[in-house]
């Protein structure tokens, strides 16, 4: 990686220093305000522990939810500070605001190895506007900056980009470094054949990724609701399945581009249909050319699963972004679960590099209990997509060069 990393800073450079660390603690909470999945908090632990062990004073900046620039009591970081304290086995104090006298007093009074969490940076509208004055006030807490928030690295915000103008050095944390190594590596210098599995309900949200992957992949497998836009573009009847009518031409162009580039583009040959969008719907398997009027496709079929598994078995690097069907309904989760199991097996027994690129695929892999078996699980939804699209991430671009 061409960016300066935290690993290049040892105790002599960190001891007694106040280090502002941007983390991604945007975790899901239930109605009682309890954290239901602490993956993102755990992902930042190696960076935080490294700083503690090297006697730095750790000041964490994070956002939570979308408070739209106002204080929202339900979006305070209180449960996150509590969970982080449990994981670290030490008290993590929370400020009342991320900037201002109270927060500065707390950061100035830290001892070596202490950890302080600044209250939600998005309580200020200046955060998302990348306001330089606000960034300067955030930077006033610290001597140097670490960005470990891959999930927010595609945003040019005050806490991801603006602060780097005031803090030197500004370096990548261990999580950010690992994300770039796997995702950038898979795109720039993969072990081939390279396959991408792209799922999800809408072509529109994956256009950039599909277009970019066609320049880089040997095979692309498409699943999820977006397949019906491709079928409709081919002139097939798709019943009541989800279709983006304004993207038919685009679907045709993508298939055409794949042919021109010699990329093997695989779409399902059979699907699981439902008579309504419900976990208890009646279901049946159908070939794609015989989908009947009142039915809708909610998963890929058994024949397609086998074809996809055989295609993936020939690959050395696989990137997966987006589910194969409505995996939230058990009846329509078979396609997604089969792909997850296939990747876990290829990773474990055939040394295939498997990268789960953010969003719903991660949820599916976690739900199946297979996360540990994958080479890399990305913590960033939008950031993963933008990186796979070949875009520059502002939060990464702003860091010091190695």
Swiss-Prot record:
Subcellular location field: Cytoplasm
Keyword entries, A-Z: ATP-binding, Cytoplasm, Glycolysis, Kinase, Nucleotide-binding, Transferase
SUPFAM superfamilies: Phosphoglycerate kinase
Metabolic or biological pathway: Carbohydrate degradation; glycolysis; pyruvate from D-glyceraldehyde 3-phosphate: step 2/5
Binding site for substrate: 24-26, 40, 63-66, 122, 155
InterPro entries per UniProt: Phosphoglycerate_kinase (IPR001576), Phosphoglycerate_kinase_CS (IPR015911), Phosphoglycerate_kinase_N (IPR015824), Phosphoglycerate_kinase_sf (IPR036043)
EC numbers for this chain: 2.7.2.3
GO BP annotation list: gluconeogenesis; glycolytic process
First-listed, main subcellular location of the protein, grouped into a coarse class: cytoplasm
Domain of life of the source: Bacteria
Catalytic activities: (2R)-3-phosphoglycerate + ATP = (2R)-3-phospho-glyceroyl phosphate + ADP
Alphabetized Pfam families for the sequence: PGK
CDD domains in the cross-refs: Phosphoglycerate_kinase
Entry binding sites for ATP: 206, 297, 328, 358-361
Molecular-function annotations in GO: ADP binding; ATP binding; phosphoglycerate kinase activity
GO cellular component: cytosol
Family: Belongs to the phosphoglycerate kinase family.
Listed HAMAP family: Phosphoglyc_kinase
Subunit structure of this chain's protein: Monomer.
Full protein name: Phosphoglycerate kinase
Naturally occurring in which organism (per UniProt): Prochlorococcus marinus (strain MIT 9515)
């Amino acid at each position: 990686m061409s960016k300066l990393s935290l690993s290049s800073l040892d105790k002599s450079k960190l001891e007694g220093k106040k280090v502002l660390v941007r983390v991604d603690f945007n975790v899901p909470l239930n109605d009682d305000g309890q954290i239901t999945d602490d993956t993102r908090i755990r992902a930042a632990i190696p960076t935080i522990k490294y700083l503690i062990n090297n006697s730095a004073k750790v000041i964490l900046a994070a956002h939570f939810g979308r408070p739209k620039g106002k204080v929202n009591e339900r979006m305070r970081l209180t449960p996150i500070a509590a969970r982080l304290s449990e994981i670290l086995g030490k008290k993590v104090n929370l400020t009342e605001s991320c900037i201002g006298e109270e927060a500065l007093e707390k950061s100035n009074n830290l001892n070596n190895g202490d950890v302080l969490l600044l209250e939600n940076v998005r309580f200020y509208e200046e955060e998302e506007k990348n306001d330089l004055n606000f960034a300067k006030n955030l930077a006033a807490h610290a001597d140097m900056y670490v960005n470990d928030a891959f999930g927010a690295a595609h945003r040019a915000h005050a806490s991801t980009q603006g602060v780097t103008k005031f803090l030197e050095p500004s370096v990548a944390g261990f999580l950010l470094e690992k994300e770039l190594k796997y995702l950038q590596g898979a795109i720039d210098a993969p072990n081939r054949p390279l396959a991408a599995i792209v799922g999800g309900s809408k072509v529109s949200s994956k256009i950039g990724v599909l277009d970019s992957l066609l320049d880089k992949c040997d095979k692309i497998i498409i699943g999820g609701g977006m397949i019906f836009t491709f079928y409709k573009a081919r002139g097939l009847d798709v019943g009541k399945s989800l279709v983006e009518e304004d993207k038919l031409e685009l679907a045709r162009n993508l298939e055409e581009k794949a042919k021109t580039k010699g990329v093997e583009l695989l779409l399902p040959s059979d699907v699981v249909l439902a008579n309504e969008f419900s976990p208890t719907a009646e279901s049946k398997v159908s070939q794609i050319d015989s989908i009947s009027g009142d039915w809708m496709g909610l998963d890929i079929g058994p024949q397609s699963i086998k074809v996809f598994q055989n295609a993936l078995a020939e690959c050395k690097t696989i990137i997966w972004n987006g589910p194969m069907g409505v995996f939230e309904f058990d009846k329509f989760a078979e396609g997604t679960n089969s792909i997850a199991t296939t990747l876990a097996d290829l990773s474990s027994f055939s040394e295939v590099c498997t990268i789960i690129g953010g969003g719903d695929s991660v949820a599916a892999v976690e739900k199946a209990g297979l996360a540990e078996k994958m080479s890399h699980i990305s913590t960033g939804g939008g950031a993963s997509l933008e990186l796979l699209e070949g875009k520059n991430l502002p939060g990464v671009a702003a860091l010091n060069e190695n």
